[in-house]
Curated annotation (Swiss-Prot):
Its EC number is 3.1.21.10. PROSITE patterns: RUVC (PS01321). The RuvA-RuvB-RuvC complex processes Holliday junction (HJ) DNA during genetic recombination and DNA repair. Endonuclease that resolves HJ intermediates. Cleaves cruciform DNA by making single-stranded nicks across the HJ at symmetrical positions within the homologous arms, yielding a 5'-phosphate and a 3'-hydroxyl group; requires a central core of homology in the junction. The consensus cleavage sequence is 5'-(A/T)TT(C/G)-3'. Cleavage occurs on the 3'-side of the TT dinucleotide at the point of strand exchange. GO terms for cellular component: cytoplasm; Holliday junction resolvase complex. It comes from Pseudomonas entomophila (strain L48). Its cofactor is Mg(2+). Mg(2+) 1 binds at residues 8, 139. The keyword ATP-binding does not apply. Its main location: cytoplasm. One of its GO terms (biological process) is DNA recombination. Pfam families: RuvC. This is Crossover junction endodeoxyribonuclease RuvC. The keyword DNA-binding applies.
Length: 174
């Protein structure tokens, strides 16, 4: 049994999802959103860092999947998103978690079967795979999808890939 944390980073809303990977598949543990409000950027990044640190403390995951930054039309938004990712990655690294990064299309492919799936399709598959009866918040759904993608990818990489990544500093880029 392995606890996996998925993070959908954002400078205003960061989604999180925790799943338990067992021999029979994945089970839902927890999900939600870290809301940073409208303060200064450094204050919002601190909230993301502390929020992710608290989730790790509460649930005890051993590995984390996080979405990669995509280059948006607005460079300022992409920069802020990258900084929020950094805050979450540092929180996970401080706790000793293995960290893997996934593109949005990789997550969609792993969960919905196509890299072009929309958010609603991804959410429906997350609900089906984790046997959820209520729709999670959209950012939490995305984070659960990232956790499921990471669980699927870990299953195909173990033992070689993650052991190699651990020797190289704990960061696995897929």
């Amino acid at each position: 049994m392995t606890l996996i944390l998925g993070i959908d980073p954002g400078s205003r809303i960061t989604g999180f999802g925790v799943v338990r990977q067992t021999a029979r598949g994945c089970e839902y543990v927890a999900s939600g959103c870290i809301r940073t409000g409208g303060g200064e950027l450094h204050e919002r990044l601190q909230i993301v860092f502390r929020g992710v640190s608290e989730i790790i403390r509460q649930h005890g995951p051993v590995t984390m999947g996080i979405e990669r930054v995509f280059m948006a039309r607005n460079a300022d938004s992409a920069l802020k998103l990258g900084q929020a990712r950094g805050a979450a990655i540092v929180a996970a690294a401080e706790a000793g978690l293995e960290i893997a990064e996934y593109s949005a299309s990789q997550v969609k492919q792993a969960v919905a079967g196509t890299g072009g799936a929309n958010k609603e399709q991804v959410m429906m598959m997350v609900m089906h795979l984790l046997k959820l009866t209520q729709k999670p918040q959209i950012d939490a759904s995305d984070a659960l999808a990232i956790a499921l993608c990471h669980a699927h990818t870990r299953s195909s990489l173990i033992p070689h890939g993650l052991a190699t990544a651990r020797r190289r500093g704990g960061r696995l880029r897929l």
